[in-house]
Amino acid sequence: DCLLSRGLGDVYKRQGSPMALNLVKAGHSLTVFDLVPAAVKVLTDAGAKAAASASEAVKGADVVISMLPASKHVEGLYLGEDLLGKISSSALVIECSTIAPDSARKVAQAAEVRGIAMIDAPVSGGTGGAAAGTLTFIVGGQIAALERARPVLEKMGKNIFHAGPAGAGQVAKICNNMLLGILMAGTSEALALGVANGLDPKVLSDIIAKSSGRNLSLIHI
């Protein structure tokens, strides 16, 4: 297996590194690449191997997993740097970044042309879910590719959903994030209203947490 993450330097304390650590703990032979040495060291200390480049990391890999910051990084890596041309046609690519659906489709189509199975599988669950191996994977792509990925995803997550064809995982993730944003904004406004009218924010939070307004945004404040 191989994990590529130019975002590990940013997310290794959050999701990328815990996900990789769970794979190592499960007995997978993992080769990792990231631009930030400290991020790589966390994983090599746990038993993973370090690669000097993304191209080196994917050499001979059965499964390639990437976690990158944005669409431009995903397209730049797989298409701009032609990483797809260096991945075996028998390999499976699991792209876990949260990116634009069109970007996910574009890369997936390029992979299909080369005979490479690829799914977009953005995650939800935060740092705690990544560390505990209870993430939710929201998958777009062919069902056959998802079933190939399932044994790997199950080492990192608890809930695995097939949202539809390529890019559908990203659409579903956007919908989830939109609702989360609404809940966060609404929770903040409700607490601000209470404080403005003399309520203790802790008391108000406790009240809402045991009432119909309870939501994850409130619980994690």
Residue ranges and their predicted role:
Residues D1-L8, Y12, I219-H220:
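Single conserved hydrophobic/aromatic residue that forms the stacking wall/gate
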Residues G9-K59, V63-S66, A91, T127:
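NAD(P)+-binding Rossmann beta1-loop-alpha1 motif at the extreme N-terminus of oxidoreductases
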Residues L30, A50, A117-M118, I160, ...:
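Hydrophobic beta-strand scaffold residues
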Residues A54-S66, S71-R114:
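Rossmann-fold NAD(P) dinucleotide-binding segment
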Residues L79, T98-G181:
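Rossmann-fold dinucleotide-binding core
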Residues G167-I219:
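Helical "substrate-binding/catalytic lid" subdomain
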